[in-house]
């Protein structure tokens, strides 16, 4: 095993997944890629046209996104420090934007990872019932082994 991807979102399950991924990377001498995805979807054409009349709200959304990006960068750095404290030296942290499952799959493909480790989540909220969970989509579409951690 050469590369392990740990997808994190700051949840308790994600921290457990990160710890497991770090232990596995250390055991196998693998590189650990720590990935946080800031959820973001570009506006559709219709929404962009509508936004002209709602300029202030769009600015507020952009400010929230910038704040989320800053928090995501901090989360990634904290995760890197956590695994380095465990003695792991080959660690790469990345923060990206987009649909979380799509970004995890894209980074896994582009980096040629051998395993993806992520926290599991129950499908208790209404959004998950309609959209499906990130871990479920990743597990069903990844070209490598996926481990979900509770």
Predicted regions and their residues:
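Short secondary-structure boundary segments
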Residues: 36-37, 119-121, 150
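General small-molecule cofactor/ligand-binding pocket signal
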Residues: 35, 92-96, 147
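Glycine-rich, Arg-bearing micro-motifs that act as flexible, cationic patches
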Residues: 109-110, 115-140
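Small/aliphatic-rich secondary-structure junction motif
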Residues: 2-59, 86
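Charged, low-complexity cytosolic intrinsically disordered regulatory segments
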Residues: 41-116
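Short, acidic/small-residue loops that bind anionic groups at enzyme active sites
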Residues: 141-150
